[in-house]
């Protein structure tokens, strides 16, 4: 598979296949990242498209190995700007979700409860800790990439990941989840 920067250069040279490959690779993860700020997946999808539109109309120069960090940094800035401008709305998505018929009812309930507790604990955390844990664990970014996205140093990211894991562990234990490992 071609590296991100090669796909970006391919697009800059006029081949839309590079754009399609980058959107396919980063569309869903970037939407989830933005949704972490907005808590509205539909708005997050729109902002994800705006991030790509900005990137591909402005065509900034991106250093080798820095495409993913640049993309997430742009998404973070757009999400924060959008969040500061919008008013809270009621979401129909929050009402209910239908369980998957293939799973046993107990397993569905247990999984939903675990997810609810995890989301509750993540929401209780310091937002900076939550963000670096998301970037390093869910987006599989290196500490250097997470530092570039957040505007912090690698040392600060290292400390924040450690403190974030400790904070999450304490919150999970408070909610009765005692097998939380680092």
Regions found by a protein language model. Name each.
Residues 118, 144-174:
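DNA-recognition helix of helix-turn-helix
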Residues 27, 31, 52, 126, ...:
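C-terminal flanking helix
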Residues 1-29, 36, 123, 170, ...:
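N-terminal module of bacterial RNA polymerase sigma factors
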Residues 12-13, 39, 49-66, 85-87:
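Sigma70-family region 2
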Residues 11, 30, 34, 44-55, ...:
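Short, small-hydrophobic-rich alpha-helical interface motif
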Residues 94-123:
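Acidic, proline/glycine-rich intrinsically disordered inter-domain spacer in sigma factors
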Residues 132-136:
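A short pre-motif secondary-structure segment
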Residues 73-92, 111:
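Arg/Lys-rich amphipathic alpha helix in sigma70-family domain 2
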